[in-house]
């Protein structure tokens, strides 16, 4: 989980209060002409409209079953694998729903980029979310049980036969310090969703293995209603630097007022010929004018890495985007960072969708 200091949280809270106060003092006419007034609603609706959807399958819980998704991914469920949240064994008809994210475009639409919680880049063989229900009752897997998954896949970039499994974390922990009703110093930890979409944490006891007999990558999922993926850490021996992406235009200032929810302005980097996606979600603080934008994790971007950037924004219900190829260059002079500037121009919603999908072939 990514931790925020109380100072950062205070800045966020103060900004949110300031924006709220300003809105209350503005007239309706002024609010409708403010290009940054939608607070991410346009981008949120856009992403939700094109996000990967669940596929549902009906199985016999007592007998066990297997089914194959539209992507050719096979799921096998042992007999008697389900139980209620109260621990009662389940038989009869059960609905199993799966959501699969296997491409950079789906990573954007589903807000599931491939980076670890500490900023390392992952080469993805797929991200998976599975849930099961009987009627209106949510089910879980029995202790020490698992469903088996087989993904059509071949090793990429010299990966060996063993690929780590990862658990998805879409929250950040905020640490708040203050005083309680008895004037005693206290520290609280609060969790909330964040802009990064998800951070991946390795499950040290779980791996996926290539099956040369049928050309699949095989692994187990031992928990429902949680994101799992089978990704290899990208090995790059190059010196790392910090990257800053500047927006020369159409940066929605409300991107900087709240650490939670959807960002009306966003920036992605797709390394060439790798099934991975980097989302730069940390905003540049104290930025003005053309210095507004996003910053990578500190010293996390390999110098010389080539890829395609996609800068996107929404203002006043309109879409803006720019796609450009770029290289993570070495810092100039005494700088400890490298930069690239973007100038998103107005596009249609269809154009925005097509730009995102085109990342799959980069």
Residue ranges and their predicted role:
Residues 28-73, 80-94, 98-106, 111-362:
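Proteolytic cleavage junctions
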Residues 1, 16, 354-357:
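N-terminal helical oligomerization/adaptor scaffolds that assemble large protein complexes
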Residues 10-16:
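Bacterial N-terminal signal peptides
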Residues 1-10:
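Bacterial N-terminal signal peptides that target proteins for export
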Residues 18-21:
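C-terminal motif of bacterial Sec signal peptides marking the signal peptidase cleavage site
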Residues 23-26:
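Bacterial signal peptide processing site
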């Amino acid at each position: 989980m990514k931790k925020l200091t109380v100072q950062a949280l205070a800045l966020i809270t103060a900004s949110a209060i300031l924006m709220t106060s300003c809105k209350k003092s503005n007239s309706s006419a002024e609010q409708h002409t403010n290009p940054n007034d939608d607070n991410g609603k346009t981008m949120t609706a856009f992403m939700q409209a094109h996000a990967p959807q669940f596929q549902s399958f009906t199985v016999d819980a007592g007998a066990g079953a297997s089914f194959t998704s539209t992507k050719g991914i096979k799921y096998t469920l042992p007999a008697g694998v389900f139980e209620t949240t109260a621990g009662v064994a389940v038989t009869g008809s059960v609905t199993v729903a799966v959501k699969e994210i296997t491409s950079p475009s789906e990573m954007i639409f589903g807000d599931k980029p491939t980076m670890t919680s500490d900023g390392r880049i992952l080469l993805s063989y797929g991200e998976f979310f599975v849930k099961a229900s009987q009627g209106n009752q949510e089910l879980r897997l029995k202790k020490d049980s698992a469903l088996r998954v087989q993904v059509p896949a071949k090793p990429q970039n010299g990966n060996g036969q063993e690929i780590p499994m990862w658990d998805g974390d879409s929250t950040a922990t905020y640490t708040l310090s203050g005083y309680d009703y008895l004037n005693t110093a206290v520290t609280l930890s609060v969790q909330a969703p964040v802009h990064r979409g998800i951070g991946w944490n390795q499950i040290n006891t779980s791996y996926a293995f290539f099956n040369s007999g049928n050309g699949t990558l095989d692994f187990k999922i031992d928990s429902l209603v949680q994101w799992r993926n089978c990704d290899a850490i990208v090995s790059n021996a190059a010196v790392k630097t910090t990257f800053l992406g500047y927006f020369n235009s159409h940066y929605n200032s409300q991107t900087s007022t709240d650490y939670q929810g959807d960002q009306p302005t966003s920036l992605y980097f797709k390394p060439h010929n790798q099934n991975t996606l980097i989302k730069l979600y940390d905003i540049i603080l104290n930025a003005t004018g053309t210095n507004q934008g996003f910053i990578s994790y500190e010293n996390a971007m390999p110098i010389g890495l080539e890829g395609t950037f996609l800068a996107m924004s929404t203002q006043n219900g309109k879409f803006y985007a720019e796609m450009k190829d770029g290289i993570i260059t070495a810092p100039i002079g005494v700088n400890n960072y490298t930069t690239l500037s973007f100038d998103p121009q107005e596009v249609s919603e269809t154009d925005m969708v097509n730009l995102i999908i085109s990342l799959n072939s980069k």
